[in-house]
Amino acid sequence: MPGSNTANTKFSTWNYTRPDYSEVKRKINDCKNKMLGAISYQMFRDAWLDVKKEIEYMEYQEEIIYIRHLCGIDYQYSLEEVEIQNKEEPSVYALRDECSRIAAASGYRNELEQEFGKQIFVYVEEHRAAENPDSMRLRSEESALKMQYRKLMAKGSRDDEALYQVFRKLIEIRCELADSLGYNSYIDLGYHIQRRGDFGTRETADFRRNIKKYVTPAVADIKEKGIDFGYPPALAANPEELIASIVAMFKDLSYEAGSYMEEMTRKELYDLETRANKRNILFTCCMLPYEKLPFIIGNYTGNGMEAGYTVHEFGHGFAFYTAARKQPLYELHRSSPAVNEIHSKTMEHFMFPYLDMFVGEHKKDYIRNHLMQQLENLAYRCAIDEFEHQMYDRHLSRVELCELWVDISNRYTPWNRIPTEDIQQGKCWPRQTHIVETPFYYIQYDIAQISTYEFYLKMKSNSGQAWADYMRLIGEGGSKSFYELLEIAHLSNPFTGNTLEDICRPIVDELYSLL
């Protein structure tokens, strides 16, 4: 494989070469045959690892152009390249998954688990969606629809009909995909894709009920007070000034965090500018395998909330950066979304002692608004999650989808009033990006939020221990299950007993004290 790109220092100078997908498949097929013909663990292991190296380098090249596409750079060219990726990937992943199943069924499985951990075979189940020609075709169609959605969003489209048609077709294709793979519904497939092997629909339904019981009433009461919860302006007038403050914060947190930010800034692994064709209101962290580096994307316009969003994404990046230097396999550099979001959301709270650098004298207002926003989001995300479960479980017309959303919204977020005419015209279905891009992901922000609150409470009593537990958690990456990772970080199970109530109560009390 070609050498490292990082010798070129800045990301903007990194070379992109479209993967030769035919050659990638030929090499993986050769590896598959070597695995089948292996007469020793070493031979089998080497061929198995070579499959992973091919995928890792392919995805690395793909990620370079995908980042440029999201940033609106060389837009037409990068768009065409990403569309080619979407067409080619399913057949490559079908071969990858075949090799994974060979490894899972082989006599060398125990030795692989001893060397790399049992979690590597838990992830094999997630990739069932490439097992037959129908599913590969449907995956390609799904990717094309998501690309169509991104184009509409990049243009700032408010074309309700166009957005709805993408939404409607995605529901149909995903249900067909689940059926082609033998799942009872897309809900089951969606849970597998999101690595939710540790908890299922029963746990998430109980979680939603508890949020509705303990969080919704408090938020509704505070909403009635008519307080302006708009975020204060940030001190940083531009992205460069914001990055300087984040660098100072990370350097003070720890040597490891400072080293991470030094490399991020030296290689300019971020883009916070606004420009034509860049995704609107997008804050995200992309992962560059092979180089083991993240890339942060944002649209910074000087708002304090945007400063927090940016720190959130740098938290994702720090977790990936740390795990990639500790865990031997790329798929172990990230965990399930319910854990990954603990990494990033907790970094938002580690930001609190440094708020003087970000919002100056508005520190109290920032904390108040942050706590309020997160509590309100707990309720809103539960509403989205219940909507997702029902929209894939029932065949509903456009108006019926709107009526369903209104009913759910009234129960979780009664402060959000939806005009009657929007219901009648079928215009009030939720426009949440996660529904289109990553079904069943959104609730995992909430599940992570409970652990984040627990970290926050620990920070206030013992900040050193909180940071040590945080570093332990991110270093493990995805090498262990959800519950095992919580235990390693000394965090409670958010689904058991009175955990949710016990953790949320002091957060609500603090918010009331700041009103």
What are these regions (language model features)?
Residues 212-214, 323-324, 334-362, 371, ...:
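Post-HExxH zinc-binding segment in Zn-dependent metallohydrolases
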Residues 309, 315-329, 350:
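Catalytic Zn2+-binding segment of zinc metalloproteases
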Residues 80, 295-299, 327-337, 366-372, ...:
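Short beta-alpha connecting loops at secondary-structure transitions
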Residues 1-236:
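A well-structured
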Residues 291-311:
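Short pre-active-site segment immediately N-terminal to the catalytic Zn-binding motif
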Residues 226-290, 303-304:
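Auxiliary, metal-adjacent structural segments of Zn-dependent hydrolase domains
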Residues 227-245, 366, 371, 375-377, ...:
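Long, K/E/R/D-enriched contiguous segments that form extended
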Residues 70, 123-125, 310, 318, ...:
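C-terminal, non-catalytic "cap/extension" segments appended to globular domains
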